[in-house]
Amino acid sequence: MDTKLYIDGQWVNSSSGKTVDKYSPVTGQVIGRFEAATRDDVDRAIDAAEDAFWAWNDLGSVERSKIIYRAKELIEKNRAELENIIMEENGKPVKEAKEEVDGVIDQIQYYAEWARKLNGEVVEGTSSHRKIFQYKVPYGIVVALTPWNFPAGMVARKLAPALLTGNTVVLKPSSDTPGSAEWIVRKFVEAGVPKGVLNFITGRGSEIGDYIVEHKKVNLITMTGSTATGQRIMQKASANMAKLILELGGKAPFMVWKDADMDNALKTLLWAKYWNAGQSCIAAERLYVHEDIYDTFMSRFVELSRKLALGDPKNADMGPLINKGALQATSEIVEEAKESGAKILFGGSQPSLSGPYRNGYFFLPTIIGNADQKSKIFQEEIFAPVIGARKISSVEEMYDLANDSKYGLASYLFTKDPNIIFEASERIRFGELYVNMPGPEASQGYHTGFRMTGQAGEGSKYGISEYLKLKNIYVDYSGKPLHINTVRDDLFQ
């Protein structure tokens, strides 16, 4: 699974001639190589995006949407190829890979359908013959930095709205999953995206990451990743005042009240915790269950978790962690929880797998009880199939514990009580609250958060607006001589 760079309409090697090995998280073996782009490669990609901007902007949103829609059709027609790449480089089970490609197709179609809805306004001026035309224009050059946990979905979520709104793009995917991104770029190119409009760069973030985000020609940076990386980007990009769309860390509370439909809550919890092996910004990372049902709920949760199959992506219920570093970090945080007095209710270690999967980066579904609210299990984003659980006795306690986090992206609540539902909608300080259902809900939802989760957002009409700058044109069409208070009229007599 080797990938190339795509710069100014050409598939090329890195100017350094260097490549980096890519490992399978399922087997731990090398499965391909990606190009190690240099600063010169970054410059060429950004210059190409700059040169292509005006022609792409002038094409108009309707014509741009036709190209984007063709890309969607090509992806849909050849989707099995993308599913296999996701399984190979990310390790997702086939069910999750198919679900991700469903999302790719849906998102691209959703954004393409917005072509005729990018409207502005005409505002009355200070008199009847003065008007203010307010309309939206593209920012210009967009740098899109995509993560490994949804290697295709996040590419679609960023590329489609950025291109529809007339921006040109330099895309840099995670070094762990460059193949999915390259495949999607090839479909956009095949669909007719002109040269320079979309450029594709791969390489270590430590080598070109700072350079690309602090580049003086970059107008907007959209990134999904860790809070630490987002903070670094904010610092580096501030010198040029680039617009930022940052979707960062999460620590989702999963709240189960005593009247909850237990089957629905458990089914959703299995998804919210073990989807993508817990490597999701909206993954359930903290479990709060009412004391009246805690023992029954936890017993069933443990038994269900015990039944999950790991290993071959074609048959597994849950995949591996992305790399050795993630595996080590997960082991360390579980050991720290043990040492602090927490109780491992299930899991807590790597599974014993045979055959090609014995060297994969798998970790058992892990449930931890009796952990302190201020411990890492409840405060730090774990990004693994690990969850801490606590009893709650009142709604006030539930709200307080849920909000006790530096993050504020997703949250989950299971109850039949309408009063709690509507009160929680106000009290829970998170960008997303899923009530009696799993997330994420459709492309038309706005994906955003509070606190250290980032800024701006993606999805829906609000997400499209993030890629557009509001511009104002002030017009006086009276044809009469102007009177300006601070300029004497007699100067013109």
UniProtKB/Swiss-Prot annotation:
Pathway: Carbohydrate degradation; glycolysis. One of its GO terms (cellular component) is cytosol. Gene3D superfamilies: Aldehyde Dehydrogenase, Chain A, domain 1, Aldehyde Dehydrogenase, Chain A, domain 2. The active site is at E247, C281. Substrate binds at N149, R157, C281. NADP(+) binds at residues 146-149, 157, 172-176, 204-210, 225-248, 281, 381-383. Keywords: Coiled coil, NADP, Oxidoreductase. It is an enzyme of class 1 (oxidoreductase). NADP-dependent dehydrogenase of the nED (non-phosphorylated Entner-Doudoroff) pathway with highest activity towards glyceraldehydes (e.g. D,L-glyceraldehyde and D-glyceraldehyde), to a lesser extent towards D,L-glyceraldehyde-3-phosphate and glycolaldehyde, but no activity towards aliphatic or aromatic aldehydes. Belongs to the aldehyde dehydrogenase family. Glyceraldehyde dehydrogenase subfamily. This is D-glyceraldehyde dehydrogenase (NADP(+)). It comes from Thermoplasma acidophilum (strain ATCC 25905 / DSM 1728 / JCM 9062 / NBRC 15155 / AMRC-C165). The lineage of its organism: Archaea, Methanobacteriati, Thermoplasmatota, Thermoplasmata, Thermoplasmatales.
